Regions:
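C-terminal subregion of chymotrypsin/trypsin-like serine protease catalytic domains
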Residues: 37, 193, 197-238, 417, ...
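Active-site-proximal beta-strands of protease catalytic cores
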Residues: 44-46, 77-80, 138-151, 189-209, ...
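Active-site region of chymotrypsin-like
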Residues: 43-50, 57-60, 120-132, 155-216, ...
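A conserved glycine-rich beta-strand in the N-terminal activation segment of trypsin-fold
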Residues: 28-34, 54-74, 99-102, 187, ...
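N-terminal activation segment of mature serine protease catalytic domains
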Residues: 21-68, 80, 226-248, 461
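Conserved active-site neighborhood of the chymotrypsin/trypsin-like protease fold
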Residues: 52-53, 71-149, 153-156, 171-174, ...
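C-terminal recognition in membrane/secretory proteostasis and scaffolding
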Residues: 105, 118, 231, 235-462
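Flexible, gly/ser-rich surface segments that form the specificity/activation loops bordering the active-site cleft
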Residues: 32, 126-173, 207-214, 226-234, ...
Length: 462
């Protein structure tokens, strides 16, 4: 009888094993992931963008990325800023099984790597599903997620991973994941493989030659706030970047004010102030992204608690909104794109030069005269220029008289010749064109493509 006992146990295990396999939680998780990726095909799009005259931080050329429908009735697609471009561009969106549809930029965020595109829903030939968005909180560390998009042109492809951290090390707060995010994934959804909800917008990954499995996504609560304000017809712009904050020993940005360049009449922040909380409604502030998020749509009436000289004080006032990216204008002169200087440069140089060279076209007259990106424009034909309108007036005068235009530039120098150096250049005027919309578009419409000819307003977008 003893010899039969092992046999009976073996038979019992054989009979039980199939039942265990059928109820294995891993199988349920696998199925949930498969369903999430299959569902994502219904509301994820491929985006193609072409840029001819880029502002700084953009590039010339054609690019592709991903996006997802966030309002099927209006034809709104959420994606990355670097996919939609901060420059005037040609954009198309393509659904799974469909052809390319023209799209326009509705909103481009100056703080987060986010943008909203708009296409004509009647031209799509379908009413796409909308994804479920996790707008309340980011998932915990270790949560299974999937990145969906078009990596290296492999369309509508999913990859798996987990959430690794929430980090502000790169500036804006980001959701860190080891799910592979490659070229073509940018702007696509990062999906919870447990709930099927979108938890982030795929944005970037660390260089593969230096690290493995470190990618980043914009947390969904920040993206939801922008979309919700747009749906209400309100401006979701964050506060203008006129306050410089200190960085701590861990290279993490803090909420300690290093310098305030807010105008007179705005909220009275001073060097050394530590921002603690937003009041009305009460909300503790943890980092700069938290501050930007909390102030969207509330910039006209800001109440902050700050620690000043060891005591907590309450400040009240307004905070100017960041300039709307889609309203930005530039002046194309002989192969150089000149526009307002970037916020990180504006106010850092004595005299605060307001105009900067954003792009120099290869082979152009501007390149031949050694104009360079980030050159600050001080004078034209010996006269100060403090706006695009004044620069355009002087350029038109030179063009009419068929004479060259002389420029005084301020350029980053070196140890040998000083931090900044002054350069003079004489530029033949091959062509003078306005880049951007002649007037500010409504929030429901996107910026126009490159426009030639109209006069610039005295208050160009920046």
């Amino acid at each position: 009888m003893r010899s039969l006992l092992p046999l009976s146990l073996s038979l019992s295990l054989l009979l039980v094993a199939p039942a265990l396999a059928a109820t294995n939680p891993g199988d349920d998780a696998e199925k949930a992931g498969e369903d999430a990726f299959e569902d994502a095909k219904n509301w994820t799009v491929q985006i193609r963008t072409s840029v001819n005259r880029p502002f700084t931080q953009d590039q010339t050329g054609s690019f592709q990325g991903a996006g997802m429908v966030v309002d099927a009735r209006r034809g709104w697609v959420l994606t990355n800023k670097h996919v939609a471009s901060s420059s005037y561009s040609s954009v198309t969106v393509t659904f799974h099984g469909g052809g390319p549809l023209p799209a326009q930029r509705l909103y481009v965020d100056p703080h987060l790597d986010l943008a909203v595109l708009a296409y004509d829903p009647s031209a799509a030939g379908r009413t796409p599903k909308e994804p479920e968005l996790d707008c309340d909180a980011s998932p915990p560390i270790g949560h299974p997620v999937g990145a969906f998009g078009h990596p290296w042109g492999f369309r509508f492809t999913g990859t798996r991973g987990i959430t690794s951290a929430i980090t502000s090390r790169l500036g804006p707060e980001m959701l860190q994941t080891d799910a592979p995010i490659n070229s073509g994934n940018s702007g696509g959804p990062l999906i919870s493989l447990v709930t099927g909800r979108v938890v982030g917008i795929n944005t970037a990954s660390m260089a593969k030659d230096r690290t493995e499995g470190i990618s980043f996504a914009v947390p969904m609560p920040y993206a939801c706030a922008i979309v919700d304000l747009l749906k209400k017809g309100e401006d979701p712009s964050p506060p203008a970047g006129l306050v410089d904050f200190a960085i701590d020993e861990n290279e993490e940005p803090t909420l300690v004010v290093a310098r305030s360049r807010l105008p007179a009449g705005a909220i009275d922040l001073r060097t050394g102030d530590e921002l603690l909380a937003l009041r009305s409604p009460d909300r503790a502030l943890e980092n700069q992204s938290d501050l930007m998020h909390a102030l969207r749509g509330k910039l006209d009436d800001v109440t902050l608690s700050v620690r000043r000289d060891g005591a907590e004080v309450t400040l009240h006032g307004n905070w100017p909104a960041a300039s709307r990216v889609i309203e930005r204008q530039g002046l194309w002169i002989s192969g150089a794109l000149i526009a307002e200087s970037e916020p990180m440069i504006r106010g850092q140089v004595q005299g605060s030069p307001s105009l900067m060279i954003h792009y120099v076209q290869d082979g152009s007259a501007a390149q031949a005269q050694d104009l360079q990106e980030y050159d600050l424009v001080l004078t034209a034909n010996g006269r100060p220029v403090d706006s695009l309108a004044s620069l355009q007036t002087l350029a038109r005068e030179s063009e009419t008289s068929k004479s060259e235009m002389s420029l005084m530039l301020l350029r980053l120098g070196s140890v040998r010749n000083g931090l900044f150096v002054y350069q003079t250049r004489t530029l033949p005027l091959v062509d003078v064109e306005v880049v951007g919309p002649p007037k500010a578009p409504e929030m429901e419409t996107a910026a126009q493509a490159v426009v030639s000819g109209p006069e610039l307003s005295s208050q160009p977008g920046g």
